[in-house]
Amino acid sequence: MFEIKKICCIGAGYVGGPTCSVIAHMCPEIRVTVVDVNESRINAWNSPTLPIYEPGLKEVVESCRGKNLFFSTNIDDAIKEADLVFISVNTPTKTYGMGKGRAADLKYIEACARRIVQNSNGYKIVTEKSTVPVRAAESIRRIFDANTKPNLNLQVLSNPEFLAEGTAIKDLKNPDRVLIGGDETPEGQRAVQALCAVYEHWVPREKILTTNTWSSELSKLAANAFLAQRISSINSISALCEATGADVEEVATAIGMDQRIGNKFLKASVGFGGSCFQKDVLNLVYLCEALNLPEVARYWQQVIDMNDYQRRRFASRIIDSLFNTVTDKKIAILGFAFKKDTGDTRESSSIYISKYLMDEGAHLHIYDPKVPREQIVVDLSHPGVSEDDQVSRLVTISKDPYEACDGAHAVVICTEWDMFKELDYERIHKKMLKPAFIFDGRRVLDGLHNELQTIGFQIETIGKKVSSKRIPYAPSGEIPKFSLQDPPNKKPKV
């Protein structure tokens, strides 16, 4: 069996960096080199301050960096020396041309394939780590075949990641499963077994699943679509709970005890975010349309539509409760990352909520323990603009949650950081304008509602009626309409 002794990973982001750090940590005899064109990112990986925050990552990196784990911008040499090359580059949703707003943009995958074949000789395994549309491996294979040379043998595998940001190291060390897809040929199966041997250093063999390449690629898209679907499903029930007096947490507990359903991903919130869910579901929608499956495409599109609705609905409740206007009012936004225990803001619901409120003229004071000011400014600015006038005028980045809440009309919790449960809310209430509102978009304050109401707060949360006095936002109850793909930069229609 072919033995993998040197690994190259192209892409030092949220997937490539942690994944290869754990491989190096678990396989001290394998030399792992993570490469990227971004020199500042590589410098950060080689410094005490890593470019991404992930619990446990720093300890893993420091245990093997400089021994069998290396970070470099020398991509060509790393490819030449490697027995296995992971492709772990970004596959964003296309923002132009055919498939705009839905299809995956594979330009970085194509660039990697061309660079790999240019710098390879002999036998080498090339493995997709990035989330890609079905049959992306076939496209890579066609590039390899069109640029073949004597004695070159490149085998293409699919090995999608299933880690969750915030628990990535735990997920990598103790995965539910490892999925490897390859060609159903002797050469393809030889490559599959070689990669299996790497994971078998710490993963039980029964947890390593092998399939054909297409099943592996589709399994990743389907897994993210199913998880997103569950969140949208419970969020749809949260709207019903608010209208009827039911509590979505109690409903989720009741249905989650059914073993056929289970209790995972039944946490109602202001909406899902992150780099994967929306991108992958939209990719699935586009794939279904391209394969002439319009009914299937419409089904999965509803998952995204419900997520968009949940965000708009929450923004509407804020405006509704604050006497139909937030113009020139100070609102504290607690949390900007898309989830706790990460600094990743991609598709964060906090971005959407902030933009909705900014378009109503609200002054936002934003605090997040792990997201730097520069990232918040970029996320709230128009594309291609370093910092637009609206952001300069309406957004302040606070150094701590108490500063953000000082003099605020309302506190809006958008990320479920544990620290928000431990704040001195009596201190916060004293410094806020009255009536003082808390809008808990993540239900992190469940169990504290009576205490907070005793202090004097008006509480609004997802999927439960807490405060009873509310002023209708509009006689019709209509929710402002915003474009799904283009967060609002215009006044809502009411």
Curated annotation (Swiss-Prot):
Annotated consequence of substituting E217D: In DEE84; uncertain significance
The UniProt record lists the keyword DNA-binding: no
Region (Important for formation of active hexamer structure): 321-325
Effect recorded for E161Q: Abolishes hydrolysis of the covalent intermediate between substrate and the catalytic cysteine residue
Region (Allosteric switch region): 129-135
GO biological process: chondroitin sulfate proteoglycan biosynthetic process; gastrulation with mouth forming second; glycosaminoglycan biosynthetic process; heparan sulfate proteoglycan biosynthetic process; neuron development; protein hexamerization; UDP-glucuronate biosynthetic process
Residue numbers annotated as active site: E161 (proton donor/acceptor), K220 (proton donor/acceptor), C276 (nucleophile)
Catalytic activity, as annotated: UDP-alpha-D-glucose + 2 NAD(+) + H2O = UDP-alpha-D-glucuronate + 2 NADH + 3 H(+)
Effect of G271R: In DEE84; uncertain significance
Residues involved in NAD(+) binding: 11-16, 36, 41, 89-93, 130-132, 165, 276-279, 346
Gene3D superfamilies, per the entry: Cytochrome c1, transmembrane anchor, C-terminal, NAD(P)-binding Rossmann-like Domain
Disease: Developmental and epileptic encephalopathy 84: A form of epileptic encephalopathy, a heterogeneous group of severe early-onset epilepsies characterized by refractory seizures, neurodevelopmental impairment, and poor prognosis. Development is normal prior to seizure onset, after which cognitive and motor delays become apparent. DEE84 is an autosomal recessive form characterized by onset of refractory seizures in the first months of life.
Function comment: Catalyzes the formation of UDP-alpha-D-glucuronate, a constituent of complex glycosaminoglycans. Required for the biosynthesis of chondroitin sulfate and heparan sulfate. Required for embryonic development via its role in the biosynthesis of glycosaminoglycans. Required for proper brain and neuronal development.
Name under which the protein is recorded: UDP-glucose 6-dehydrogenase
Gene: UGDH
